[in-house]
Amino acid sequence: MDPIFQSLQTVVDRYDELNEQLADPEIAGDGQKYMALSKEAGEMRETVETYLHYQQVLQDIADAEDLLDDAEMAPLAKEDLNTLKPEKEALESQLKILMLPKDPNDDKNIIMEIRGAAGGDESSLFAADLLDMYRRYAEKQRWTLSIIDETLTEVGGYKEVAVMITGDNVYSKLKFESGAHRVQRVPATETQGRVHTSTATVGVMPEFQEIDFELAESDLEEEFFRSGGAGGQNVNKVSTAVRLVHKPTGIMVKMQEERTQIKNRDKARKLLASRVYDFYAQQNEAEYAEKRKSAVGTGDRSERIRTYNYPQNRVTDHRIGLTLNKLDRVMNGELGEVIDALVIADQTAKLAELNNA
């Protein structure tokens, strides 16, 4: 028997145990425990229901095969088997995917950082276009996108912008967006009609509250300064902006988006908590630096995960060889086809690793 299926009965047993506990009035009266058990049961529900359906299909196949020796019932049994056997195979594939190890961060909100990189002003404008694309996708998913911090350029683009996206399973869908995004188009400032190539980089991190990871005050170094606007001019005479440094790792964040020092500090701590947690999750500085390099990117034109070709209305994801001739729709937030293909490719790779183990 496939080792994946050997563990399914354990999942069913645990699911039944959880439902018994949830029916206990004593547990129902403990809100925090009840919510934790409900969440665990909810995460198992699809797997259990699919497995029970699979078991029923196996039984139906066995019953139909028993009827093949009955001259009168054999034609109907064969007809049933023609339907049941493909259904069995489809359910087996579905169960293998459901039983893949879950990314513990998949249900988390995210912090996304977008930076204009190679290409000057045009790269900052493309960074703004990427933000609009993700904003529209978030709206279609009924998520909420809010800007944490931004540094505008004089042409109306972003040197860098950090946003928080909250909703259901945000990280699971957007974690593959990390990397360098290349655009090929004629800039608005181009008088000769020549196509230019520019790059913006995207970094995606799961959001970690301090309930997940505590930042010790003794490990923090903070500095308050005046908020600045585009071009570096001061727009606030009061020191409301904050810079936080996590001394053990050297990770630094600054926040000036809000009008008050308290709000800026709160946002800065959230961003810092995510970055520090991410750092320790990588085990050591070398792994962290390599991951950040591959996630956020250096901005070099040759380092890319996706190309957006405006003259040909084409978007290509180089990691999986996917090309779609509907860039206009993708930029309007219709990212589902790209994201679904990336998720399937990731699942396929994990299944191959599991089968080869």
UniProtKB/Swiss-Prot annotation:
Belongs to the prokaryotic/mitochondrial release factor family. Pfam families: PCRF, RF-1. The lineage of its organism: Bacteria, Bacillati, Bacillota, Bacilli, Lactobacillales. SUPFAM superfamilies: Release factor. SMART domains: PCRF. This is Peptide chain release factor 1. It is found in: Cytoplasm. Keywords: Cytoplasm, Methylation, Protein biosynthesis. GO terms for molecular function: translation release factor activity, codon specific. The modification N5-methylglutamine is found at Q233. HAMAP family: Rel_fac_1. Methylated by PrmC. Methylation increases the termination efficiency of RF1. One of its GO terms (cellular component) is cytoplasm. Peptide chain release factor 1 directs the termination of translation in response to the peptide chain termination codons UAG and UAA. It comes from Leuconostoc citreum (strain KM20).
